């Protein structure tokens, strides 16, 4: 099974406004994919469709080779929202309790933690270097520390796919690089498939190996190396267009009155 996500000709609209038009792409097993685009480009809508929050209106989506409508093994997918720390900054739960909540997909609600669960929590916190904060309240931590805890919550069930929606929102600049290094290590050492929604082109150029750019439709889909060439070509096109406009203006100025 090499294709973790398959999106084929998916369209979605809100009332009469098209949010997505004929979107098609694949996320391969073991890839670190960046999904990018300007505000209002449909990135969040695409994530909601993949995660089943919204129902597609046209096209098909498959997860791990299964039609999304038939997919039941959601424990394979971890999700980190951009608003995790905003929702929990004043919440009195401990780090252990927050991470343990990531086991509900596997165990159900209000289940007592067994030794295997405790080992899973320990594993997840070690991966994000937060074991010393086990009994600290989540509200006491910085934005970067909180987001590491929420990655641990996503990792505790050992997902094969980790989806992150603008995960560095609210993270101080000093911790952003360390955060992306952590994601790259998970991709490299755990062979975990990552789908990262971001505006951070530095992160895209530095860490991901597959880029999908959308603006209500597919703009680019290829390797990170190909994307750098694409950007360079686009910059040359923009400069050429500016030169044509400048030349046209000069011609207008030179015309006799």
Curated annotation (Swiss-Prot):
Keywords: ATP-binding, Nucleotide-binding, Transport, Zinc. It holds the Pfam family ABC_tran. One of its GO terms (molecular function) is ATP hydrolysis activity. InterPro entries: AAA+_ATPase, ABC_transporter-like_ATP-bd, ABC_transporter-like_CS, Metal_Ion_Import_ABC, P-loop_NTPase. It comes from the Bacteria. The keyword Nucleotide-binding applies. Coiled coil: none annotated. Residues 5-241 form the ABC transporter domain. ATP binds at residues 37-44. The keyword Signal does not apply. Involved in a zinc uptake transport system. Belongs to the ABC transporter superfamily. This is Zinc uptake system ATP-binding protein ZurA. It comes from Listeria innocua serovar 6a (strain ATCC BAA-680 / CLIP 11262). The gene is zurA.
